Amino acid sequence: MQYSIEVNNQVEIFDLNKVAKQASGAVLLRVKNTVVLATVAREDVQVEEDFLPLTVQYIEKAYAAGKIPGGYVKRETKPGDFETLTARIIDRSLRPLFPKGYAYPTQIVVMVLSADPEVDLQVVSLNAASVALYLSDIPVNRPVCGVRVGYIDDKFVINPSNSELKQSAIDLYVAGTKDELLMIEMRSLPQQTTQLIPMVAIEPMIDPSLSDSMAQKQVMNEFSEDKMVEAIDFAGKAILRASSAYEEAFKEHKKEDAALELKPEIENENIAIYIDKFYKAEVKNAINQMAKSERASELGKIAKQISSDEVAQKEGWDEAVITNVLGKYKKKIVREQIINEGIRADGRGLEEVRPISIETNVLPNAHGSCLFTRGQTQALVVATLGTDSDAQMYDILTEKAPLVEKFMFNYNFPGFSVGEASPLKAPGRRELGHGNLAKRALAPSIDLASPYTIRVVSEILESNGSSSMASVCGGSLALRAAGVNTQKLVAGVAMGLIFEGEKHAVLTDIMGLEDHDGDMDFKVAGTSDGITALQMDIKLGGISLEVLKEALYQAKRGREHILALMTQADKNIEINEDVLPKLELFNVDPSKIVDIIGQAGKTIKEIIEKFEVSIDLDREKGEVKIAGGAKKNVDAAKDYIISITSKENSRSFGKKPFKHDKDRVKPTFNIGDEFTGSVKSVVDFGVFIELKDGVDGLLHISKIKSPLNVGDQVKVCVSEQKGNKISLSLVE
């Protein structure tokens, strides 16, 4: 059975009951030439633990783009970062739909079987998974829809194509039902202006006399709070259209809900009364302790104490029931205090940010580092600079060639950060998600024309909420500490929202306790001029645009407070020049690149070994990039390369010469000819002297009696000439 639904700028063709009929729910969705299979399967036996055992897997098949997997194992193996992040988006969007007490192991699998380069796989995959879940026998009574919003030529565009998205100022992904928004992710997309500026204005380390290369200026494209509300409202209307269309089309095909037993909420009014009467002070004290840590061990101690009381033993109260009721009582106390008194568990006001301390370049041998502490959340963020060869290469299903990533952000969350003795493992979905959020926040501030490959690592040393936003703040300062000239400082703050009846409270800089007991997790990062990244997960029903706007502006005030402290810390940064890599970027005639490489790479290998540098060449632009640990080595390598490319006998292998070389009369020299020339460059093995018509000769170090500097006038004579390679001697 096939349904075609035209909605939100795309035609979606759903095939029902065609494939995977043994699954609880399955759907084949086609959009243009993209085909996605989404399946839902569940077990019949509940788990004993009190959580939703939902697993979401998103798999891209290489054959979907006519590819064979690379590497030794020619099949799909470990999921890539994009697959993991997409699975996380689907999970966060669908998890709120499951009824309370649902504890049956459930697996949602989305497989990309055919990939159109212009179709957004994340939008299509979520919509396919949503319909498959809605059609299944799991008691989910409303479909979710995902949409992407771009902002192109001052207009919002729903579900732009992949090529259109590259022209957009923002990338906004929103998921929800016809009644409520459930998940939001946003990033600003930096763009290039058409105004050309000298490369030296972008990267001061470049020698302006040698680099006539030009680069375009980058615009960060931060989004204002008002514009963000407008964009989310635009997305909400699109979600309403699609979700309503899904429900209307598929309601009659939904399977009858299976007779599943839902775990009842553990309630015991007598225990709650007993706690309120005899343990209220202990609970409040536990809340104060929990405000300092993400661990909940204090409540466990109280539960054990209550279960050992005579009343509890007489009434036969189970410790598990006591623990559950105690947790709800704690949540009630926390929320009531915030709503009624405007005071949080740690004594802060609603808009108050925890105390912040900042130290930069605390690691003497790292390129740039920052220890950023906010309350009981602490991040050690380290920036490392590299060359083009250090960039990350990765495959995208819809791209023919591997892509290169020159800015990387890694987030690590060890167990000791929350006082747990857990084994250190490979990064999971949470670590990848938090790292991706921090990367999105910082990326617009890093100029695309930067010659460096940059890796930032955030080590969470303490955590009590908002560790990803601490990573953003620390990361922005670590980049500055490494000498990276970012356009602006970027700060992040985690917001919370609590609803009680008609009242609500927006919280700035939430801690772990408020994240757990609140109704919304809302992370906002940006500069003083606007938002660069945003992530929101809503645990309750719909949120009004007025409340959303209030939260965004409150986040802006918190962000400005943090930026003021970061700006002061930025002024006090002492860059450790001794450990920073030295880099030179200059241009030569593209036809001379072959001379730098030499036969079978012999020349470039000799340069790399002799001067202990790394060299990256761009054959098309004639761009040469030299990096090394010592400035004198980099300068010497640069001078040596310039000497190679300035020779008239350099091999061009059929390349066209510069126009101004066409009619040049090549100078001739005789042994013994004397000249007074200027020292053009100084290298380890001698100096190059400018003779006439731009031709240089080498005065070897063995023939130099006293130190010479660039610009010195020296009288020399030609002692040897091999082709156009001229050796000189001093004239006494």
Swiss-Prot record:
It is found in: Cytoplasm. Residues 672-731 form the S1 motif domain. GO terms for molecular function: 3'-5'-RNA exonuclease activity; magnesium ion binding; polyribonucleotide nucleotidyltransferase activity; RNA binding. CDD domains: KH-I_PNPase, RNase_PH_PNPase_2. It comes from the Bacteria. NCBIfam families: PRK11824.1. Involved in mRNA degradation. Catalyzes the phosphorolysis of single-stranded polyribonucleotides processively in the 3'- to 5'-direction. HAMAP family: PNPase. This is Polyribonucleotide nucleotidyltransferase. It comes from Campylobacter concisus (strain 13826). The gene is pnp.
